[in-house]
Amino acid sequence: MFECWLVSKDGKHGRIRLPHAETVVIGRGPETQITDKKCSRHQVQLMADCNKGYVKVKQMGTNPTSINGVDIGNEHKVELKPGHTLYIVNNLYPYMIEFLEGSTNPRAKIENENRSSSKRTPENSLNVDTETPRKLVKKESNVSPSSSSGRISSCPTQGKSNVQEVKSQGHWSQDLKVSMQDPTMQVFKDDKIVVIKDKYPKARYHWLVLPWQSIASLKVLRAEHLELVQHMDAVGHNIAREHTNSKCAPFRFGYHAIPSMSHVHLHVISQDFDSPCLKNKKHWNSFTTDYFLESQAVIEMLKTHGKVNVKERISDVLKTPLLCHMCKKEQATMPQLKEHLKKHWPT
């Protein structure tokens, strides 16, 4: 069974273990190093479900506890999942959860986790390259589909070394933070961002643009991030232009409303959706409904409102019928949809 850990995103202290199906209460005190008097000593009640991969959160204190910037209130228990950010009180003191494979020596594991956590800060965990901006030497395997016909022949699997590294660092939702530092995955990088191949591409061309800065989700973005987001958009368009041709399907540039990975990332994806990794309705609807926020729309929201507005219950659109993104005809199954899409491919 996996073990659940509560991790301070500020890196102020070691991880806190959340035993399966046991209630853990945290708040102001030496364990969290929170001294804010607005935070109760019993601010938040947590109960991990290591089988289902989430933590039930209940606010116990008077002042608001929130997940991804949304207050949870005193009356409800809310699911905290990998990739989400828990703010203990007043949108301060951010935490995330990780699920690690259980250790046969729990004490040694805890000591190792605390030791590694105490050395890690948000700055040194992600800003691995602060050299003068430079473009990587592009290898054909890094920037083009895996066959000469322009199609992805099979859904890629994780390399052995990467699998071991990801497992040692945490839950699959943390995988991006490993991939963005893997030279074999990188297509371009500078002092602000890195572009990587999507490990499970949903189209013939699918890249991710990520900031080195640790930003958990769209809801964390503020006006001060505008220049960074504009830079991500510009780099995404350049990558699409440089590595495709006039016969390629058009591209879209945007973000998932609620990212599956715990690091904000811009999708640069061709609209052929010709990939064996595109397997289910959730995959499809995440790129063809309002769940996919256009990059320019995000930029305009930051310019106008200083933040990104994500619709309530936006996840419901992932359950809507399968509609072709070109002609809007409904398709009964994914195989039927994928066959239908061939009619729209560039000739």
Swiss-Prot record:
One of its GO terms (biological process) is single strand break repair. Residues 23-72 form the FHA-like domain. It is an enzyme of class 3 (hydrolase). Disulfide bonds: none annotated. One of its GO terms (cellular component) is nucleoplasm. It catalyses: a 5'-end adenosine-5'-diphospho-5'-2'-deoxyribonucleoside-DNA + H2O = a 5'-end 5'-phospho-2'-deoxyribonucleoside-DNA + AMP + 2 H(+); a 5'-end adenosine-5'-diphospho-5'-ribonucleoside-2'-deoxyribonucleotide-DNA + H2O = a 5'-end 5'-phospho-ribonucleoside-2'-deoxyribonucleotide-DNA + AMP + 2 H(+); a 3'-end 2'-deoxyribonucleotide-3'-diphospho-5'-guanosine-DNA + H2O = a 3'-end 2'-deoxyribonucleotide 3'-phosphate-DNA + GMP + 2 H(+). A motif (Histidine triad motif) lies at residues 263-267. Residues 110-122, 131-141 have a biased composition (Basic and acidic residues). The record marks 179, 256, 267, 282 as: Interaction with DNA substrate. Its EC number is 3.6.1.71, 3.6.1.72. Residues 142-154 have a biased composition (Low complexity). One of its GO terms (molecular function) is double-stranded RNA binding. Residues 198-202, 260-261 are annotated as: Interaction with DNA substrate. The active site is at 265 (tele-amp-histidine intermediate). DNA-binding protein involved in single-strand DNA break repair, double-strand DNA break repair and base excision repair. Resolves abortive DNA ligation intermediates formed either at base excision sites, or when DNA ligases attempt to repair non-ligatable breaks induced by reactive oxygen species. Catalyzes the release of adenylate groups covalently linked to 5'-phosphate termini, resulting in the production of 5'-phosphate termini that can be efficiently rejoined. The histidine triad, also called HIT motif, forms part of the binding loop for the alpha-phosphate of purine mononucleotide. This is Aprataxin.
